[in-house]
A protein has these predicted regions:
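Active-site groove signature of glycoside hydrolases
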Residues: 26-33, 37-40, 48-77, 134, ...
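Generic structural signal for well-ordered alpha-helices
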Residues: 1, 52-53, 163-172, 208, ...
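Aromatic-lined carbohydrate-recognition surfaces of secreted/lumenal glycan-active proteins
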Residues: 3-11, 64-68, 102-131, 154-200, ...
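Substrate-binding cleft of secreted/luminal carbohydrate-active enzymes
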Residues: 60, 208-233, 241-267
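Active-site-adjacent "subsite" loops/lids of carbohydrate-active enzymes
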Residues: 5-58, 75, 83, 92-101
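Short acidic, glycine/proline-enriched helix-loop-strand junctions
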Residues: 71-118, 247
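The substrate-binding groove and active-site-proximal loops of carbohydrate-active enzymes
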Residues: 1, 31-46, 150-162, 218-224, ...
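Aromatic- and acid-rich polysaccharide-binding/catalytic face
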Residues: 132-151, 199-229
Length: 267
């Protein structure tokens, strides 16, 4: 008897985004990222629950959940072009969702969204009208707070908590059906030169500590060519989480240069 795993891609769905633009991530200028659904939107969260219920009803052993988070400015359909050099800070601010539901999520915590919207918009206007002042600087929460103010950190915390609640609701469905809940973690792709992927997960709205308490298994995308880089990332997850871990490697170019290279990474 075969054990069947369902690989579900949740928030990266252009067909739904184009048919329902109100469900798409919407930045501070009102630009819609139609390839990306906003997980804060209750209708989108409901869709994620419905998709999960449908899959667990089919006698599967596990759900491998991909794209259950935000993605960033460059993910898109992989055809997007900016034609100017943008820092990681600018890309991050440009991709932040301020759809009505993200605004409500922030204001439900007792905060006024207007100052935050103004600061983000003004900061990005400097880039587009003059030059990106953050080129060469690493994206950190500390730098964001310096640029925008502490409100940005509150915003990020609120969205992490809301996304964690979506995971909790999905987990209730999988547990009731006796289905394993696996999370495809794209954090290693945020900074291809970093061995500490977990420290970058906040950039896509994921609080690893919260998710660690909900899911059954992390499946990080460890797309690296060097054997040591693979080992370092695996160590990062082994030390930073206590859920199960199944690394996803890419057996083709450019990650694997030879059969021996792949064998060494697996072993």
């Amino acid at each position: 008897k075969f054990e069947i795993n369902a690989w579900a891609v949740y928030m990266h769905n252009s067909a739904i985004g184009m048919a329902n633009p109100e469900a798409a991530v919407t930045n501070v200028f009102g630009n819609k990222f139609l390839s990306e659904l906003c997980p804060i939107n209750p209708a989108v969260a409901g869709y994620a629950i419905g998709l999960t219920k449908d899959l667990v009803s089919r006698g599967i052993n596990a759900i491998t959940a991909e794209s259950l988070h935000f993605h960033g400015a460059r993910h898109g359909e992989h055809h997007e072009r900016f034609f100017i050099e943008l820092s990681p800070v600018t890309e991050f601010l440009f991709s932040l969702c301020f759809c009505p539901h993200c605004i409500k999520n922030y204001q439900d915590g007792g905060s006024d969204i207007a100052p935050l919207l103004s600061k983000v918009k003004n900061s990005l206007s400097i880039v587009f009208e003059k030059v990106d002042p953050w080129l060469g600087k690493r994206l950190t929460k500390e730098l964001l707070a310096e640029i925008i103010g502490p409100d940005i950190l509150t915003y990020l915390t609120y969205r992490e908590n809301k996304i964690a609640s979506v995971y909790k609701n999905i987990s209730k469905v999988t547990k009731a059906a006796g289905v394993i809940f696996k999370y495809v973690d794209q954090s290693p792709l945020i900074d291809m030169n970093s061995a500490k992927a977990i420290e970058s997960s906040w950039q896509i709205g994921i609080d690893t500590k919260q998710i660690n308490e909900i899911i059954d298994c992390f499946e990080p995308l460890i797309y690296r060519q060097d054997v040591t880089a693979v080992a370092d990332l695996a160590k990062n997850y082994l030390e930073g989480t206590d859920a199960g871990i199944t690394a996803i490697l890419r057996p083709t170019y450019p990650d694997s240069t030879s059969p021996k290279n792949l064998i060494n990474k697996v072993s």
